Amino acid sequence: MIKWPWKSNETAPDALLPWDEALAIPVLASLSADEQSRLVQLADRFLQQKRLVPLQGFELDELKSARIALLFCLPVLELGIEWLDGFHEVLIYPAPFVVDDEWEDDIGLVHNQRVVQSGQSWQQGPIILNWLDIQDSFDASGFNLIVHEVAHKLDTRNGDRASGVPFIPLREVAGWEHDLHAAMNNIQDEIDLVGESAASIDAYAATDPAECFAVLSEYFFSAPELFAPRFPALWQRFCHFYQQDPMQRLRENAGYDGNASPQVH
């Protein structure tokens, strides 16, 4: 059990929530004791500020709420809870859900179709998730639905549409775009060679820059050993933006000893 070193002038997290049990998931295993305690404090504030809304009969309990909050706060552990401003509700379906999608093709024709979604994030509005994919986000596998949708929120924090470039200094934008597009091209080259199902990075990352940023944010936090050695320049930019280094954390706290893989600069 973790001993929470709360300062006397800080408000302790809700003791009724099962924080120790909530932390016991693989994606959080490499966090230090100090990082875990700070993450819990952020997650507690998240639950005070946001409303989790279960839909279609989904039953939300304290453990589920705590784990959802922890994953929401993982990307902003060093940025601060204010980076999650801009939405007040998280809607949670029991499973992937169907939505009406409208899109325009290259010649201007508008199409409507019903599509199955795992999650959605609106620039001004709630985040929509489903529990089946949230559960899959507990593993250190490279998939993390919550981190993906949070990344979209961070992407639009500058008030513009999602572009794959989060709120960073203007002088860093060109370099970020260069490295992000290099990663997209590399991922697409692998897809062309081995197919989507055999690609080592989720093929969704190659669809556009916004999705590349969101997908690679998933790998940044849940499978850094697949991201860092392959795209070292972009990895450093992610570390600078998130103010975290999950690869170093993995080495220090989980005894990782991986082999290097091809690099893209």
Swiss-Prot record:
Q: What is its EC number?
A: 3.4.11.-
Could you name the domain of life of the organism this protein comes from? Answer: Bacteria
What cofactor does this one take? Zn(2+)
Q: Does the keyword Coiled coil apply?
A: no
Pfam families given in the database record: Peptidase_M90
Q: Which UniProt keywords apply?
A: Aminopeptidase, Cytoplasm, Hydrolase, Metal-binding, Metalloprotease, Protease, Zinc
A GO BP entry:
proteolysis
Family annotation (SUPFAM superfamilies): Metalloproteases ('zincins'), catalytic domain (SSF55486)
Which function does this protein serve? Involved in the modulation of the activity of the glucose-phosphotransferase system (glucose-PTS). Interacts with the transcriptional repressor Mlc, preventing its interaction with DNA and leading to the modulation of expression of genes regulated by Mlc, including ptsG, which encodes the PTS system glucose-specific EIICB component. Shows zinc-dependent metallopeptidase activity.
The identity of this protein, by name, is: Mlc titration factor A
Organism of derivation: Enterobacter sp. (strain 638)
Instruction: State the taxonomy lineage.
Output: Bacteria, Pseudomonadati, Pseudomonadota, Gammaproteobacteria, Enterobacterales
